[in-house]
């Protein structure tokens, strides 16, 4: 399969650069994985697609204000995007500057703070901060908005680029399907008899990196840390036993569950995953998916195509464009039931 198979033309006006006034105000495009039928709804209509006994699995990672600005001791300006917190003082980060800092050099952080460049690990820099890094980021860091939201972060992004159920600090990008849920909607879901469970996957900046090969089978995924607990495994098993459906909220929840079930059986798992889900890969756990609209030629679009079928996914995206849906992190959403026999790019509608 070629990366070019997953391209589409998106008008710039459909890129959502700000969230709507209310989380639940988004639109919802539903895709029946069996029939391929589409329906245009509001996000609150999601309740109509849920059944008592279903299990919704959310990613409870919390975004850290991971973008810092500063300067080298020589005076040159730089920008830091923390990719992963290693311990209380050390991080791996992307550093953008005219010249890369050298090991042993000092970095002065705007707003107060200092770091030392310890070592370089391929594209990432290991930095050691003089003070504890998480309090420093909370104090002077900026929310790491995706590159397609081409504006400076605002105070409101500290709330809106965060799910209402986020708990575990560590992500540098939000699990955006969860941004549509407010507490009253979560309460209504529970009142309908739908169970909930929480995995953790700390989304990395690599989620925005383009696929740089022609054939997707040659692509190597970036690594991200996740945890699927025994409680989640028990909840999934109970759901399946009662005939319920496992509904993943977001591609990160899919990647978490399917990473923990690579041999076909879901087991507790804690550690890094580089799972790459593209058309042809089977799903062992997830039955339905809530997800946003993703970038052309992205691994996330490939995952959705594996779940819903390639022709059905691309047709749904064209319908979304034709009907003015808002795309990407602050955009609208889809609800997809899994296609039992998904087709690839070679099997067009």
From Swiss-Prot:
GO cellular component annotations of the record: cytoplasm
Keywords: Cytoplasm, Queuosine biosynthesis, S-adenosyl-L-methionine, Transferase
Biological process according to GO: queuosine biosynthetic process; tRNA wobble guanine modification
Localisation: Cytoplasm
Record-linked HAMAP family: QueA (MF_00113)
Quaternary context: Monomer.
Protein name: S-adenosylmethionine:tRNA ribosyltransferase-isomerase
């Amino acid at each position: 399969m070629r990366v070019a198979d997953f391209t589409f033309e998106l008008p710039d006006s459909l890129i959502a650069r700000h969230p709507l006034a209310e989380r639940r105000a988004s639109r919802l495009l539903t895709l029946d994985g069996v029939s391929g039928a589409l329906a245009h709804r509001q996000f609150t209509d999601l309740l109509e697609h849920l059944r008592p006994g279903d299990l919704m699995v959310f990613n409870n990672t919390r975004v850290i204000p991971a973008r810092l600005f500063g300067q080298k001791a020589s005076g040159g300006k730089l920008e830091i995007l923390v990719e992963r917190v290693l311990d209380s003082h050390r991080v791996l980060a992307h550093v953008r500057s005219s010249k890369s800092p050298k090991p042993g050099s000092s970095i002065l952080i705007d707003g107060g703070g200092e770091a030392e460049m310890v070592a370089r690990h391929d594209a990432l820099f290991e930095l050691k901060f003089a003070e504890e890094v998480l309090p420093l980021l909370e104090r002077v860091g900026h929310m790491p908005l995706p590159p397609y939201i081409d504006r400076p972060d605002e105070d409101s992004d500290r709330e809106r680029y965060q799910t209402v159920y986020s708990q575990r600090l560590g992500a540098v990008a939000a699990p955006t399907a969860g941004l549509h849920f407010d507490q009253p909607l979560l309460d209504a879901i529970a009142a309908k008899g739908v169970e909930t469970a929480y995995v953790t996957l700390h989304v990395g900046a690599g989620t925005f990196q383009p696929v740089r090969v022609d054939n997707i089978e040659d692509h190597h995924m970036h690594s991200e840390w996740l945890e699927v607990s025994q409680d989640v495994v028990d909840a999934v098993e109970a759901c399946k036993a009662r005939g319920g459906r496992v509904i993943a909220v977001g591609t990160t929840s899919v990647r978490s569950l399917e990473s923990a079930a690579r041999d076909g059986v879901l087991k507790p798992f804690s550690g890094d995953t580089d799972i790459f889900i593209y058309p042809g890969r089977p799903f062992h756990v997830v039955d339905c998916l809530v997800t946003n609209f993703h970038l052309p030629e992205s691994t996330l679009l490939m995952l959705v195509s594996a779940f819903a079928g390639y022709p059905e996914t691309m047709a749904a995206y064209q319908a979304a464009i034709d009907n003015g849906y808002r795309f990407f992190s602050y955009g609208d959403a889809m609800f997809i039931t899994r296609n039992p026999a998904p087709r690839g790019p070679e099997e067009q509608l």
